[in-house]
């Protein structure tokens, strides 16, 4: 917990202090006063009655003593409950397929006033230029968009081909940027545990900031060693006792509920009055359809309250104050004097019904955000340009030879989880012994001219057709799954033609596709348009079989070697438990 770095983020001049204090004392006129409001007390529980007084970006006072205070403008909350703006403790905005500007437009009106973002998706594709663009977006955003400096680009050295490197020298150039809060998820946990100097150099360089972790399922001495290296949190926990042990050992626990990785139900029972300061909420990866139809952090709070009976003040605490304290953002997370006026007014606190949002002391208007989106995106100078350096493919590129009677490794998908299982399947002249086996291939897209890496996939639910995408964590090569080589080739060629994107093929034809012109990861369309296109893609994908709820996000993690158990990268089949490549055929 890095309270010592608060000065980096809390910029207030002496003049601003004097003006704020004058309003607090009652000697000057406030900019805004919110009347007819109850403030949820995140520290003691219960509510505080009375107005909220705002001067500039900050709260000057709270409580009944300001009932008659003067203000330039008054906001009638109409009996609403006020809570601090919501904070997402860990996410990759690129996974929403929205630009940071569009993401803000989609989520700020839902109360998400702050995000802690790791832009390692775009950094894996285009290196420092991608990070620089995210920093430009953060500088101009109304939303508080903070960045963790991507630590593992690529995710695991020597295991995949990606588009760029991000050296320690480049990382250090961003360390003191005002929007940078620390070092992003250290995914190479075996390297940290074994004391690899290159990784310890990165940890040492950012040790005065927040050091993010990534250690799914880790326990025992290995977990102790990982924490001893200075890692402060983890968002990858998926089992109750795993989360409990991490809390016991001093880690902060990020409870994740994304579009593919859904860990809230497993971990929510851990949250209580005692440990809630060490618990945070995050989405990691959430697509625009879910944001539009279900929400973002607001959806997670709602579920904590309605499904897990978490007390109101605790649910909102883990959605704001706990995260602010963890990242040293001491000007955020509470509705109290001197704190930044990031305020969410709720007409129903139990249902998390957002009535109005203020950020940095100013009311947010959703229509204004939408109207300004195009100009603000252009102002950020997005890094356009085709990042697909791959020639079209043919069905013969996916040809695999199988021997009857032999056993082959199959990546077994677990719906709504990022981990996979490794299982075997026996081939005969009639095919494999289980009819859920389909084909998967990964094609590097950065000009290395490698042949496709091919494998077998089970449990995905694909009965016909093919799905292809350039969103494929973390190197973002082209991943394709299918029942026939011909349809796999058709899907791959469509995303190559689009300059990156998503595609569904069935009955020998492209049924739906979505171009992603920025790094093959993001669209420049509006959030509403993007949600509609995702809806069409999902509808087309559902015609291919009983797929996961979010088939493209689930598919995107089948190439990430730092999450067990069996994955496929552009280099081949990777055992995520042994951290070594393995063979498709079992050798006795």
Swiss-Prot record:
Its EC number is 3.5.4.2. InterPro entries: Adenine_deam (IPR006679), Adenine_deam_C (IPR026912), Amidohydro-rel (IPR006680), Metal-dep_hydrolase_composite (IPR011059), Metal_Hydrolase (IPR032466). The keyword Hydrolase applies. Signal peptide: none annotated. Its cofactor is Mn(2+). One of its GO terms (biological process) is adenine catabolic process. Belongs to the metallo-dependent hydrolases superfamily. Adenine deaminase family. It comes from Escherichia coli O1:K1 / APEC. One of its GO terms (molecular function) is adenine deaminase activity. It catalyses: adenine + H2O + H(+) = hypoxanthine + NH4(+). The gene is ade. It is an enzyme of class 3 (hydrolase). This is Adenine deaminase. Homodimer. Keywords: Hydrolase, Manganese. PANTHER family: ADENINE DEAMINASE, N-ACETYLGLUCOSAMINE-6-PHOSPHATE DEACETYLASE.
